[in-house]
Structures are given as structure tokens and as C-alpha cells.
Amino acid sequence: EIGLGIPAEPLFRSSCLMSPYTSEEIVTRQFIIGEKPTGIINIVDATNIERNLYLTMQLMELDTPMVLALNMMDEMRGNGGTVRINKMEAMLGIPVVPISAAKNEGVDELVDHALHVAKYQERPGRMDFCGEEDHGGAVHRCIHGIIHLIEDHAKAAGIPVRFAATKLVEGDQRIEAALKLDQNEKEMIEHIIVQMEQERGLDRAAAIADMRFHFIHQLVEQTVVKPRQSKEQLRSAQI
């Protein structure tokens, strides 16, 4: 337990994409949906933020209190980079804490924020990431149309409805099975998704990925001053 008698929750590192087909995504979401943790500390590598925010967005859709920890900020600053923390918090709707785990910098502040969001159950303030890339609002309408159809099913299954709707668009059969939809509902959902694909000119999975990556690009563009690449990063990129 960490202070205040609140059980410590697992730390999730955003080092992989939570696609419908990865074991990491399945284990992560099964734990969060099934165990209902009081909060999540999501640790990402500050020197490679753009790559690591995809999982963060998917975790936010699970509607669980979360703090985003930007690790290795000392290295980022040493290479001439920085992050506009307040701006990033405003755009994501969750607390963002710069830390250096290796030097034990910012860790106390991270724990304080984690305890606060867990105690008061402060959930992510933003879960709709549709932006200007969603020409005519096709993805937005698709997700919200599905939400309207599955609200009762999601509640009965204990699955956050926005997360469930997004996963249905991505073709996640585990979520579909958990929702126990009837054939008529499945056909209506398929019709909504096909209509979205036609409007966007992208298949369903690509449309969702495009939505997320566009938001990440906008977020990084507005909040991150990118550092010079270290020798280690250059070698990693070449590999």
C-alpha cells in the first residue's frame, strides 16, 4: 500500500500499441475492466513521447483515474528538449508529471498525484479524440451511434461504453462477445461502420488509428520541444 491506505496499482509502460490483437492489450484491459483498479500510473519515455502516447489514449478510454509520468525528463532536458506540462495536461485531461526514475526526481510528486486521483476517483477529462482529420465528423458520428446502441449492454458487462464502441469499430470479437449483442444490433452496428468507412475513405481500423495518430501529432506539436538525438537514440533508429 502507498500512503493513505490506498493499494498500489500496477505500472503500465506505454511501450507497445494496444491493438485488438496483442496479448499486452488483452492482459491490460482484462485487468482494468475485471479488477477495477483505483488508478493507473502510466509511465512513458519522455525522449520518445510520440511513439508512446498511443497506448495512453487507449488506457484513457477505459475511464479509470490515471496519471501520466514522463520518465527520463533529465535526459530530454540535457539534450535541449522540454515539455509544456500544463498544456499537455489541458489537452489530455489528466495529470502529467515529469520524473527521472533513475535519479528519483519527481517521484514523490507522482505518488501524490496518483493518490489524489485514486482517492477522489478523478477520471480522464477527455476521451473523444476526433479532430479535423475526421472530415465531416464521420468517425465521431460512428462511435456515438454505436454508443447509443450498446449503452445497456456495456453497463451490464462492466465495460466502459466509449472503449467498447471504439473496439467494435476496430473489429474486436472479444468485446463483441462480452456485450452479448443480438443479430439485429450487430447488423445495425455493421451498417454504421460501413457508412463511416465510405465517408472517410479508410477501412475501420485505419480510421480509428488515423484519429489517434492525428491527435498525438497535434499534442506533440503543441507541447513538446524536441531534443537533439543522443548517440544512443541515433544508433537505435539505425537498427
Question: Where are the regions that the model predicts?
Answer:
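Short, small-residue-biased leader/transition segments that mark boundaries at the very start
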Residues: 2-11
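Conserved nucleotide-sensing/catalytic segment adjacent to the nucleotide-binding pocket
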Residues: 12-22
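Canonical P-loop GTPase G-domain recognition
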Residues: 74-131
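Extended helical scaffolds that flank P-loop GTPase cores
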Residues: 93-95, 120-238
